Amino acid sequence: MLKIIIPTIMLMPLTWLSKKNMIWINTTTYSLLISLISLSLLNQPNNNSLNFSLMFFSDPLSAPLLVLTTWLLPLMLMASQHHLSKEPLIRKKLYITMLAMLQTFLIMTFTATELISFYILFEATLVPTLIIITRWGNQTERLNAGLYFLFYTLVGSLPLLVALISIQNLTGSLNFLLIQYWNQALPDSWSNIFLWLACMMAFMVKMPLYGLRLWLPKAHVEAPIAGSMVLAAILLKLGGYGMLRITMMLNPQTNFMAYPFLMLSLWGMIMTSSICLRQTDLKSLIAYSSVSHMALVIVAVLIQTPWSYMGATALMIAHGLTSSMLFCLANSNYERTHSRTMILARGLQTLLPLMAAWWLLASLTNLALPPSINLIGELFVVMSSFSWSNITIILMGANITITALYSLYMLITTQRGKYTHHINSIKPSFTRENALMALHMTPLLLLSLNPKIILGFTY
């Protein structure tokens, strides 16, 4: 694992030692090399030799998320170049340092063996993200958004620490690898119900669960492009990853405690999809679509069958790439029209024809068109929830329909129709942006050829 963690840490001195005109080239190529090294983790031979030390390990669940994390750093650097071009050099370097720091924390979070170190790193990712949102956001509301983000996440995860200490007293270990062999079931008692709630709440706020999702649209809308990308693609997946890891030790509590949360997620996924249909703000629409996709992941994790686990993992990876791509597209529109309102930036297909092709591809993967991995994930979740209860097919069907509706609504509003008068002279799309979209799209298309590497540990 150190072959990925140490190069990422060394990205920080590289940033500060780079010359003014080489800063983007150095950091982007270097981080791309790191992501190519991390690809070897996906090839895990099917024996029990986990690539682990006492501190860090990777298994079929954490490896895809880890590769996604390393893959997104060069993409974030590529996306940030334009809006940082006016900033002084020291701020550019600070920005890249923050991204590298966040990357390091995320890699260590996804590979930690101890639950306490997982918790500490889970909280540590908060600091760079907060600095990125509150320092480089676009509007003054960014401070408000940062405050929401900080308090929701902190208040959600404080009970988790207490719960972890209590599990430590109960089992004598918090090691992921050892705790799977702890075969004593938790007895039914009020304290254990609260233990379950404390463990799950931290991750449900992070996911976010419908009802605890107020921080997400705020944070997304106010964050700069790299903040939005890392938030949508990776920080939401921390919640799913934590839930997948921690449900193993909470049996049999999950079997009856899951019902209210399952209902809330099934309801919330339809509600947030419907909210998307009424959005005027482009970034806000993409943020709400993230909430509705993550609700599917919560449903999948709580059903607790091998199929639903596979669906949850596939959906997390697929959504990470898709939503990140959508945020990049929204940002490239914003850099030209200086407005996130969809009505003011319509009809861009005539002005940016190549961007329209990327918009079409991104919208189609977002509505889970076959043969994308979004479809594979959704299909697994729908099938496992149908076998859990037949009525859920109505809710799932409604959700998939509304998802298709708002994706097409987004595509038609931004691309089709007559363009407004105030955007008659805008820059054409840069090679950098097209390369960025291609680097988002290629993994999505390639993974649909071989989806088994992202189906997690139950495949």
From Swiss-Prot:
It is found in: Mitochondrion inner membrane. It is a multi-pass membrane protein. GO terms for cellular component: mitochondrial inner membrane. Its EC number is 7.1.1.2. Signal peptide: none annotated. GO terms for molecular function: NADH dehydrogenase (ubiquinone) activity; ubiquinone binding. Keywords: Electron transport, Membrane, Mitochondrion, Mitochondrion inner membrane, NAD, Respiratory chain, Translocase, Transmembrane, Transmembrane helix, Transport, Ubiquinone. It comes from the Eukaryota. The keyword Membrane applies. It catalyses: a ubiquinone + NADH + 5 H(+)(in) = a ubiquinol + NAD(+) + 4 H(+)(out). Belongs to the complex I subunit 4 family. Core subunit of the mitochondrial membrane respiratory chain NADH dehydrogenase (Complex I) which catalyzes electron transfer from NADH through the respiratory chain, using ubiquinone as an electron acceptor. Essential for the catalytic activity and assembly of complex I. This is NADH-ubiquinone oxidoreductase chain 4.
